[in-house]
Amino acid sequence: MGQPLPHGHGSVPIGFSSEPRELTSGGNTDGVKPTLVTGATGFLGWHVANRLLARGERVRALVRDPSRVRELDGEIVVGDLRDPESLERAVAGCAVVYHVAADYRLWAKDPSELYRSNVEGTRNLLTAARDAGVERVVYTSTVGCIGMPEQGPGNEDSQVDLEQMAGAYKRSKFQAEQVALEFARAGLPVVIVNPTAPIGDHDFKPTPTGKIVVDYLKGDLPAFVDTGLNLVDVEDTAEGHLLACERGASGERYILGCENLTLQQILTLLAAISGGKAPRWRIPYAVAYAAGLASTGWANLTGLEPRAPLDAVKMARKKMFVSLDKAKRELGFNPRPVDGALKRAVDWFRANGYV
């Protein structure tokens, strides 16, 4: 099992600037090495960084565009996963790296962009971490890298076939996970976490799961397909990252999820929370597939993002139901029911002009 790492204490009330700078805090962080978080301008990375800050960590965020940083205190370093020199600067002096950043688009006109960011970017970052003597890396994979058996939920030992994986996102994340395992075998302490479908506030883009909430609230989901997700509170997912750092074993992966729910159940929960009505009509998979094919074909011609990406439809063919036993047993992961996170998501999207 991985050994616990030391944590600082106190708050860190300083905002991001366009240049790297040291943190000041009410507590004493002198001599405490910074923790690097990639993807801190995104949904999950933002929550991981905030969780660390709340525990008094010295947090350094790797960002491509400082103007996108919102409501987050810490130190900033501008860089890109595709630029090894910028990563060397980012990891310098860090004890721990949380690699949360990913290109999670379910459609891209040039799918090779996902491989450059997700696969080669991960290799670049882990190389920099190894060369800088980083003590611990938490790599954020995805539940999409967990196999879904015909019977019962998937777990960390459930294998997937790369050739049968739907889309560049899943394939690139699978290959990136293999890179992380390669570095772990070579001696870099790398723990892998596989979040399911986080939900909650500050979903800026939003993510595909957040988009379900937004589309429902806007009345753009009059019907649903017969699929299922494992939903988890994004705050619990962030806490799971910290637990993986403290207690996880290098070279192991841990599913961070909570409740296995059908899409119909999710929409029913949203109706109860928002005061709306749940859709009643189920779309046959063949109809959804045809719509995805047409939508994606038009996107490939125009360059405009498809309304229903074909890869998303393909992913929906299987219910992404998983077991949390390993994370609960080895990490002490204890997620809360997701209705509170769904309510925070609804309230945040409404308050911030998404609907």
Predicted features, each with a name:
Residues 34-55:
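N-terminal Rossmann NAD(P)H-binding glycine-rich loop of SDR-like oxidoreductase domains
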Residues 67-68, 74-120, 128:
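NAD(P)H-binding glycine-rich loop region in Rossmannoid oxidoreductase-like domains
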Residues 120-169:
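Conserved Rossmann-fold NAD(P)-dependent oxidoreductase catalytic core, especially the SDR/UDP-sugar
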Residues 141, 178-201:
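Conserved beta-loop-beta element that borders a ligand/cofactor-binding pocket
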Residues 166-168, 196-205, 222-235:
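Glycine-rich "substrate-gating" loop/helix at the edge of Rossmann-like oxidoreductase active sites
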Residues 221-225, 231-236, 285-330:
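A hydrophobic C-terminal alpha-helical subdomain
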Residues 240-307, 329, 337-355:
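Mid/C-terminal beta-alpha module of Rossmann-like enzyme folds, strongest
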